[in-house]
């Protein structure tokens, strides 16, 4: 189930995408939903709820601007600290920049303290603080530096008035701020008019920050912030202002592009849709969607915030600047006072010396897919240079092209032509000659000049380097060379004059050498360094302390509340032993500490009531029973009682309620009782006395004195058993209530015994600790108990119902008090029945009851027998289970009996005992009687005064189970007078019938099955990943467990899974399910587990509940696991022998299946040589062995090709692999076996041209709809059995998991790594590749034709993950519905194929039809595609999946990503699709069905484009090729041979039956393969790898040609070769020779030679394993 978890994680990743959720919304109202749709919808809903819950915990920020969903998602990702939403109610200029400014302000404020703090917002928008944070002390410095600033101020004043006059409610703080601002503006304007200094306002001022006159009150912390406000302020002025105001912490942000550090003068700010531009020492910022005035700032002052790290203020304080976050186009920085470090270094000497410090930082550079290229042109007669950012791929392509050419081929025009051709998306005759980003064409001419000059210079430079390396590498050393080397080492190789000239050139800005045309790759980062040299040191001032008296006061109040509550509880403890009082007090005090947490509703309640609870007293102890819920009332209690508060909690807080502390008399636990004299335990009583409603601990009564009458003894034992069972249940109820009152049950998050729930009824009715769901209530009784004593009593319960469904979780009609509900009180039928029986039993007639038993196997139709043989006018029917009773009632009603009579006389046994009939009956029926106690049946007979009971049951299934382990029963089984065996089953699949017969569980005749299902079982254990419960798949099927504990665990595991049900094996007896998962979770042995002492009936019941499939999940590979594993391998023909239809209706040749035919091999003679084999090949295919094709692949790869091709694009700039030579075996046989090709661009184009682009066009006018309808209808009469056609939902967890388990690890990893959602997957795009292995030709065409490689068109792995499980399920359904004489080759070996033809009698003659199709995959048209989809519809495909599948098969794009080929294909079968083999097979079946009388076929087998059909001799068969061409577009030919063949295997009669044996000519051709490559560089490696490779080939050949040692097979094959290939000699000698070389590995190695450095190597056999599909 690790796979299942991996598949589940994949779905969770899908629902993270917004588009998936949108698609789910669009399909929410669809009526054709799939199970996969429901699963994803549920996951998406849970995911959205989780996101919503997390978002609600964040600060909500409404940015108000109109934003797209993409922009809003980008903001949420950029600022995850906030819950960003937009009401889309505003539209303005530079929207993203404005929204980002709001979020940046909130983000910076979240990093600064607010309480008892003054915040200077440098250049901030004071209006924002006034409107939304008027209670915070924020002062904004908004200087008027130009007219633009004055205009912004007027905008803010207008917005203030608009906000103030909108008529909505306002806070008092805002009103005060508004009045203050209005007064300040009047004073300021008056001062400006008078020419005097303006006054200051605590909300804002119009001065620069360094001149701000605002002084807050003392005792508050001072911090500052700046949001896009430092552009016009030098860093020095900023720190001077901070120093003057005593501010030690400043956090700000500004726009920045890292490309400024690279000298770029203009660029974009993509996130805010803006740009920057450097012009004359200034930097400008502007926005593309904004027409307002832009901003211009000093560039050097701006860059100081990036480059500087230390700044010394005017009075010596040192501030350190750090860039700490980059979000979008905004960079955040911190400016903190770090003077403390400089002062800490003051020493006697160091105080006179400066402090020096050095730091560095790395600025990351985005978009490194570009390079900087110098471009040149002439302007006004001068060469002008410009450095431009260009795509790295384009520049590298040009450089690589120059490197591939010789010096004399380096021409400007050629290079320019290449750059243009690779830059323009032009298709000429289907060939595209560019791939990559498009560059402006006027840049290409400049780029070509730069690259050409660069290449010429680099080549000259490389020549000099080579010369110098050759000279320095000389082994001859002279004194002159030594002196030259020493001189160069110390003075360099460049002369002093040259170095001086280069220095002067740099000073003058003159470029020279490689500086002119170097292509610069963008760095990953820019390193910035800064240092500090400090003489003067500032002074440190302390930060004002914060008064936390309010927080301390709240903590002390909480502590005092706890102490006060504890003291009040101490006063309520009466006299008693010190130890008892202490222990009780500790328990109560601990609860008080827990409950006094004021963060919970209960804590707040106790804290508020703890003072008043001390003063409240009640006058009598009766007040505690009134249900008023007093918090801490005083009571008069005995020495064994304690007092504790009763807590009243509202229903909404029920999950947070700690355990109740209920005052009651403390009693001893059950384990303390050691004698029967205990007053708390009722002594053993007469088993015939009724059980009252009091819930007590009772002892079990003694067993009755059994009389000699067996039936009477059974009746008494049954009554005794009921009494014991009731006493045990009552004792369990008593214990649960005591555990609750003793606080042993204290955590509602944990499970309660017997699924108990506790209800308090009073002024407020509430569930304690946890509340049930509506599905968990419906109890018929509950236990009422008191708070102060041990009185417990059963009381009936009523519930509010509507249409028999419970509508609420609170019962009706209960008085005040405590109530316990549990599984034991749900029905209480046994208690009611017992009390009823003990009253009426003495008066019942003691008549003897005759027992007649219909002993039938599972699914034999016992209920149907009752329906046919019961007369409800004279008999009644009793049954054990409610479901079986309801089913019988329904069927009797359908038969015509009145509904009232059916309800009266078809009853459950419990219903009958509680409400018996007054009328007497002579006989009655009892369904599943063996599950009941014999005494129950006898009592029912006496209550009916009956003489005979007709019982239905299975003696091998689970009998009556004693639920009271403390007692032993002797008379639970009844004596059968008449027994009738039924050995037929309508339910069980044939493999289960086969298993039951094989195990001999049932005596007498073998069981016969009527089911059409053959293989239905599967196993999962450690070897397949099932190791624990977490690996159990969650599927909508029925789960069976052996134990009740396992049932509970599985139920929890499957909670919420729609359609999943769970029961024990015992509970499932008599029931039927379509799909079953049988589960064993315990590794330890148990008597019920397979192999245990009582396991047989459980095994039978567990295996016989399903009709379609059973999967056994076991953590232990026990006996049942081994049996089922072996059962999976049983052949279908063996299973069919258990079928009733096979015994009444003869299958083809079934009359011969009981005949044992002696089939012994006749060993072939050990004679022959290679010459004989070679002679046969040369005479069969003359001229093929003389052909040398060794250099064909190289010639094609290295020569020019001239092809006409259309509907494709070609990227010729893809890398081309060189032709490689490898060490290969040298075969001694010379055949036309094509060499293994090496992939290349030419091979890919050839394969595409000769295969996918050469489709037949033979189809005439066709009425597709009519042909499809008629053919499908005919197919279901000729090919399929209607009753086996399955149209249930295709997409299930089970089918997806089975498909997933078959995938390779690589494929799984690829699918898990693909995070695309369904709307992002292009199902119409396929990958294209070529197979390196060439299919051998068994004709003369290799002499004149260069065979094109086979092409593979395959989708992406994620597309296979979408369609694969569906197609796999459809194929399985199709195969299971085929008729017995129709077969599909599903990777069958020769032996498996031979089994399909076993029923054919070799003496019969047949009309054989073999059709050879050409270009089969490529011949597919819309007729084939829709025909196959129509078939898929009949087996469950529908809805959106059907549409996607049809779309993926119509117009498709195939891409060869290795060699840059892209083609466009209409229809065709994609050879790498998940349904390729199945679709090809079905197309062949339908086409031949339309052209041939398939209803007369005796035997037909299909596999892809291969088919073999046998008709009775004399059947008139017209040549179908004409209709196949004109109607089905197939280019084919009909072949007539005496010996038929299928998939390269001849159907030959050997040993009295037909066999499929592989074609020997195909093997001989393969033995001439000259390209069996061996990896290795040394002799030992070549020998080792060669031995392994030859061993694999030999093992594969022996598996496929194992019968070649039989002379009878070789003789029959010799006849087949003469019939098919027409050699002019008898092939027997060559076949005997071939058999000789296959008998041993040593003989097989004689077929090949290999030489290493002239030495022939010998090879040893290495034991290897090969795959089943590995065929050589």
Swiss-Prot record:
Residues 983-1145 form the (+)RNA virus helicase C-terminal domain. ATP binds at residues 856-863. Its EC number is 2.1.1.-, 2.7.7.-, 2.7.7.48, 3.6.4.13. GO terms for biological process: DNA-templated transcription; methylation; mRNA modification; RNA processing; viral RNA genome replication. One of its GO terms (molecular function) is RNA-directed RNA polymerase activity. Residues 853-1113 are annotated as: Helicase. Pfam families: RdRP_2, Viral_helicase1, Vmethyltransf, Vmethyltransf_C. This is Replicase large subunit.
